C-alpha cells in the first residue's frame, strides 16, 4: 500500500488535526488538468492536496480539498459498523494527552475510551469531514 486518500472540506484544518496526532505535514500542491479529469471522471476537477506521514515515514494520508466541481450530494456520518473503509488507526504513546490536545482541533469522541483486555486503551474520534480515527495506546 502506498497511501490513503481522504477528501476534506477544509484542508488547513485537516492538516492541523493530523499534525496534532503526530503526523508530519508535507508540501501542499494544486492539482488540475485533463489527465486528472479523465482519471476521476470529473469535468473541470481542481483540488489542493497535502500529504501527511507517520514519523517513521511508512504511512501516508493524502488530504484533498476540491475547489471544483462542487460536491452536491448529501453528507452523512456513517456509524462505525457501516460497510466500506470506516476508520484509520494510529498508535499513540499517551491516549489521554492526545485526546486533550486533539479536541482543540474539533475532534469528538464517537463512544467511550475503553481498556481492551489490558492490551490496548482504545477510542474512536471523529476527525475532519466526519472520518473516524481510532487511537490506540499499547498497554503491555
Could you say what each language-model-derived stretch is?
Residues 68, 117, 139-140:
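A short acidic/small-residue loop/turn micro-motif
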Residues 7-58, 97, 104, 123-126:
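Core segments of cupin and vicinal oxygen chelate
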Residues 1-9, 50-67, 74-101, 121-126, ...:
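Vicinal oxygen chelate
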Residues 107-114:
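Short, basic/aromatic recognition patches
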Residues 42-44, 114-117:
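Short loop/turn motifs at secondary-structure junctions and domain boundaries
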Residues 33-39, 71-74, 116:
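A cross-kingdom feature marking solvent-exposed beta-strand/loop segments within repeated
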Residues 135-137:
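Conserved SAM-binding loop
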